Amino acid sequence: MNLKIINICTFGYDRFVDAEMEDKNKIIVHFMEYDEYIDNDKKSERKFVGSIIKGKLRIDLVTGSYIKNGELMFEQPHRHSSHIIATVEVKRIVDEFSLYAKTNICDDEILVEFESKVKYGINDSIYVVGSLEFDIIS
């Protein structure tokens, strides 16, 4: 997946990016830039407004979840924050802490990683609260 950076907030190695997907929908993602530490609101020299970044989405740091019947949805209620609330459909179980899910964010299945053990089944519709992460592919 390719994302175009619309806005970028930096803090140390952390990057919070308002991005435009190829279908022109907008999302906010978090990723780490280990090759560039930035403090005091300096500008990144590696990633900046207009840059295209390539990678994979995942929902991480899920601290709350439960089975919820309903349509696929997501919202990111906080400005410049990767915080996400979503209803997703379980497609593959990885282990007690992770699964792949169908979302309405994109066509690809997204890895969802939980902070505690969960027991969901294939095709369960679940509500999750976490962080929308972007794993950059070099």
Positions of predicted regions on the chain:
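Structural detector for short beta-strands of small beta-barrel domains
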Residues: M1-D14, F74-E96, S125-V128
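Single-stranded nucleic-acid-binding OB-fold domains
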Residues: F11-Y13, K47, D60-N69, R92-I93, ...
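Acidic (E/D-rich), amphipathic helical modules within compact regulatory domains
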Residues: V17-N69
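Beta-strand/loop nucleic-acid-binding surfaces
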Residues: K24-R46, N104-I122, V128-F134
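A structural signal for the main folded, soluble domain(s) of proteins
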Residues: F48, Y66-N69, H78, E113, ...
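OB-fold/S1-family single-stranded nucleic acid-binding modules
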Residues: K56-I84, G130-S138
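Glycine- and charge-enriched low-complexity intrinsically disordered segments
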Residues: S81-K119
